[in-house]
C-alpha cells in the first residue's frame, strides 16, 4: 500500500436500530449482527433512536456513547434526498407501522444500493428495492 494514503472500508450493509440494540443488549441474533458490524453503516436517525432507547432503559450515557462510537463509527447524516425517499415510504406504508427511523434506514440502503439488517419481519413485506436481511 502506498504510504500516506488513507484506505476506506467499503460498506456492505445498513443496520436498523433493532440490530444495534440486539448487539448492545446481547439479544438473540446478536452474533449475526456482530459478524456484519465491521462493514456496517448506520443512519443518524437510527443512531438517535438507539441512544434514546438505551438511555431510557437506564444505561449510563458516557458508556452508551463510548460503545456506539467504537462499534459504529460510520454514522451517515440524513440528507434531503434520503428524507424525500423516507417520507414517501412512511406515507405509503401505514399498514406496516414503519417509523420515521425505519424509513430513514431503508432510504439510506436504497440510496447506497446496500442490504439492510433488521430484526423486524414486517420489513420483508415492504415494496422497496432493498434486500432485507433478518438477523433473528
Residue spans for each PLM region:
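Acidic, PIN/NYN-like endoribonuclease modules and their adjacent C-terminal/linker elements
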Residues: 1-12, 106, 110-136
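Short, well-structured N-terminal submotif of metal-dependent ribonuclease cores
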Residues: 1-42, 54-66
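Short loop->beta-strand "edge-of-pocket" segments that line small-molecule binding or catalytic clefts
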Residues: 13, 39-41, 71-75, 115
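Histidine- and aromatic-rich ligand-binding microenvironments
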Residues: 15-16, 42-44, 98-100, 120, ...
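Nucleotide phosphate-binding site architecture
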Residues: 21, 51, 124
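Short, structured coil segments at secondary-structure junctions
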Residues: 36, 71, 128-129
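Acidic catalytic patch
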Residues: 72-93
Amino acid at each position: 500500500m502506498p504510504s500516506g494514503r488513507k484506505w476506506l472500508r467499503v460498506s456492505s450493509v445498513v443496520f436498523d436500530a433493532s440490530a444495534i440494540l440486539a448487539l448492545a443488549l446481547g439479544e438473540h441474533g446478536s452474533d449475526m449482527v456482530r459478524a456484519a458490524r465491521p462493514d456496517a453503516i448506520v443512519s443518524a436517525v437510527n443512531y438517535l433512536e438507539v441512544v434514546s432507547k438505551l438511555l431510557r432503559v437506564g444505561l449510563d450515557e458516557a458508556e452508551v456513547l463510548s460503545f456506539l462510537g467504537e462499534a459504529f463509527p460510520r454514522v451517515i447524516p440524513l440528507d434531503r434526498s434520503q428524507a424525500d425517499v423516507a417520507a414517501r415510504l412512511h406515507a405509503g406504508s401505514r399498514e406496516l407501522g414503519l417509523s420515521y427511523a425505519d424509513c430513514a434506514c431503508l432510504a439510506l440502503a436504497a440510496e447506497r444500493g446496500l442490504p439492510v439488517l433488521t430484526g423486524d419481519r414486517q420489513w420483508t413485506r415492504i415494496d422497496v428495492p432493498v434486500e432485507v436481511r433478518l438477523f433473528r
